[in-house]
């Protein structure tokens, strides 16, 4: 399909900046706009453009978004606009789901165990409650646990070094000690949390070029929706 026909059929009402984002062919493209301005609509159009105008194999496209619900909604919207066949061929995934694919590939192909299983939410709360009581000699309130989990997520997502953690002021007393004990408890139980999935996958990609090359060959185009919600 030529570009003019594609724009007529699928990009009606798009402004020049939106069209430029859809048509971009080389390098990285970042689309910044206020909520509700149509970023996801533009992303869906770009996916269609890559397939219909550029001849990209949909199996070579990875689209990531923030929640499981959002992946289902994007697949539905793309399928309604461009056909379910293309939508089924594409990988539309959360970041955590992609991380588990990377971890699984590493485990299967490098003779490693798949490391850890996912810690349940209630289990994580229980572990943190026990550690909090041990360190503070007091019972943790719901607010204290919530603040702890927020701080731990920040530390893991930002991949802070022990030195950076010591210097960080995240509003939680004894955070370095609690953080260390929490991770020790998870390892002893063979568990990891959602944030561990991403940092573990990142470490694998950095340390094992063969794994990185595999996913680079598998996906020639990567699109990220709601990228403002991702960490570094």
Language-model features, listed with the residues they occupy:
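Short, contiguous pre-domain boundary segments
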Residues: 1-4, 161
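Conserved helicase NTPase motor core
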Residues: 3, 11-23, 27-35, 62, ...
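Phosphate-binding Walker
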Residues: 38-45, 68, 73
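Walker A/P-loop NTP-binding motif
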Residues: 41-57, 77
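Conserved catalytic network of the ASCE P-loop NTPase/AAA+ motor domain
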Residues: 53-57, 83-85, 215
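Conserved P-loop NTPase-based nucleic-acid remodeling module centered on helicase motor cores
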Residues: 60-150, 166
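Basic/charged alpha-beta structural segments of nucleotide/phosphate-handling enzymes
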Residues: 124-195, 209
């Amino acid at each position: 399909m030529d570009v003019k026909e594609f724009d007529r059929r699928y990009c009606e009402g798009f402004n020049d900046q939106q069209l430029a984002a859809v048509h971009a062919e080389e390098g990285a493209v970042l689309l910044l706009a206020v909520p509700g301005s149509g970023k996801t609509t533009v992303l869906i159009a770009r996916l269609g453009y890559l397939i219909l105008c550029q001849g990209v194999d949909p199996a070579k496209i990875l689209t990531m978004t923030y929640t499981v619900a959002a992946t289902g909604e994007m697949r539905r919207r793309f399928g309604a606009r461009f056909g379910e066949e293309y939508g089924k061929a594409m990988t539309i995934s959360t970041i955590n789901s992609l991380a588990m694919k990377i971890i699984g590939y590493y485990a299967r192909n490098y003779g490693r165990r798949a490391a850890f299983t996912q810690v349940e939410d209630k289990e994580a709360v229980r572990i943190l409650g026990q550690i909090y009581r041990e360190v503070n000699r007091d019972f943790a309130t719901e607010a204290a646990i919530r603040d702890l989990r927020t701080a731990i997520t920040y530390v893991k997502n930002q991949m802070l070094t022990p030195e950076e953690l010591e210097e960080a002021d995240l509003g939680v007393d004894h955070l370095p000690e609690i953080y260390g004990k929490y991770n020790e408890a998870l390892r002893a139980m063979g568990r990891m949390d959602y944030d561990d999935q991403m940092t573990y996958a990142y470490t694998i990609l950095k340390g094992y070029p063969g794994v990185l090359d595999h996913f680079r060959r598998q996906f020639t185009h990567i699109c990220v929706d709601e990228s403002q919600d991702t960490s570094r």
